[in-house]
Amino acid sequence: MAKKIRGGEIIALIGELGSGKTTFTKAFGKALGIRQQISSPTFVMMQQFETPKGLFLYHLDLYRTKNFADVKSLGITEWWGHPKTVTVIEWADKILDSLPKNTTIIYLHRDA
């Protein structure tokens, strides 16, 4: 998936606690060439990383948000779809109806 990234993509991750949303983002970032430690941004809500190709990976965690108004008030949506960004959103189900139509949605499930 990371090999097909050109910029402007938005990836929505949906799954319960412990289903692998952050693990997916770590592997995705590594595949993009990011060497920094990627962790869950639950308390800061967003982390930004630059790839060797000059793209910026924005990693969002919406666990503590209630709705799209919370996200929009932070100014986060201003760079969605920008050709120099790739956005991965954890807990995207909270704003699914407000995401652009070309968003890639990935559902993750925990093993029993």
Locate each region found by the language model.
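Short hydrophobic/aromatic beta-strand immediately N-terminal to the Walker A/P-loop
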Residues: I10-A12
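Switch II (G3) loop of P-loop NTPases
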Residues: L57-N67
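Conserved lysine of the Walker
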Residues: K21
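P-loop (Walker A) phosphate-binding loop of NTP-binding proteins
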Residues: I14-E16
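Short phosphate-coordinating micro-motif centered on Lys-Gly-acidic
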Residues: K30-G33, A69-V71, T77-A112
